[in-house]
Amino acid sequence: MSDPLILIPARLAATRLPSKPLADIAGVPMIVHVWRRAVEAGIGPVVVATDTDAVAEVIEAQGGLAVMTRPDHPSGSDRLAEALEIVDPDGNHDVVVNVQGDLPTIDPAIIAASVMPLADPQVDIATLCAVIHRPEEMDDPNVVKIIGHTVGPNRLRALAFTRARAPWGDGPLFHHIGLYAYRRKALARFVALPQGELEQREKLEQLRALEAGMRIDAMIVEDLPLGVDTPADLERARTLLAIRRLN
């Protein structure tokens, strides 16, 4: 497996929190925090893929690399595929890691962990999950659950993803973390597929891959990164990063 390439899709047109990549957290735009965490993961070069000059400028001011992509992509995966061809047209990287641009508190170690399942040649896409401990999250449709079976230490093979409380019965429930490591060929296949029936019903694009027979494995991690989607999330991220600076 070649050194992975980390790509961070970032766009300003978020519905619930417009311009969130540029939101100030401890004096630094959020996208810069995410870029720094990705660099600290130490698994390969990091590039921000954006449709906005302002985002590219703040990354380049930090000495990072940003590429401009089309503004009309239907999903972050499509933006990822375009950025990959811009950054690496010769195919030197056969793995691409998609780190969402709204995870300013993410632990670099779990970014590094995301590629581990790809050591198995049967795995097409790798991702992350964490055990759900808070009872209210078990029935929360905004907390996506992964249903899978154990295939190795702290590793599941995904059988389904759902917004419902599942699976039934005794045992842990797992919160899916939307960070993906794709084999390059798997990403190209994925973005070429039409939307799947379950994908449209659950509004979860990873179901497209499962419906097409692709294999997704997930590493179980301890740290659940905070996704910033609302003003309340932004305030929580500011608090968490302020505490880290004090420590």
Curated annotation (Swiss-Prot):
Localisation per UniProt entry: Cytoplasm
Domain of life per record: Bacteria
Gene Ontology molecular function terms on file: 3-deoxy-manno-octulosonate cytidylyltransferase activity
Keywords: Cytoplasm, Lipopolysaccharide biosynthesis, Nucleotidyltransferase, Transferase
Keyword set includes Cytoplasm: yes
Gene Ontology CC: one annotated term: cytosol
Any GO BP annotation: lipopolysaccharide biosynthetic process
CDD domains per record: CMP-KDO-Synthetase
Recorded catalytic activity of this chain's protein: 3-deoxy-alpha-D-manno-oct-2-ulosonate + CTP = CMP-3-deoxy-beta-D-manno-octulosonate + diphosphate
Known pathway: Nucleotide-sugar biosynthesis; CMP-3-deoxy-D-manno-octulosonate biosynthesis; CMP-3-deoxy-D-manno-octulosonate from 3-deoxy-D-manno-octulosonate and CTP: step 1/1; Bacterial outer membrane biogenesis; lipopolysaccharide biosynthesis
EC number: 2.7.7.38
Assigned protein family: Belongs to the KdsB family.
PANTHER family with a match to the protein in the record: 3-DEOXY-MANNO-OCTULOSONATE CYTIDYLYLTRANSFERASE, 3-DEOXY-MANNO-OCTULOSONATE CYTIDYLYLTRANSFERASE, MITOCHONDRIAL
Described function: Activates KDO (a required 8-carbon sugar) for incorporation into bacterial lipopolysaccharide in Gram-negative bacteria.
HAMAP family: KdsB
Protein name: 3-deoxy-manno-octulosonate cytidylyltransferase
Gene: kdsB
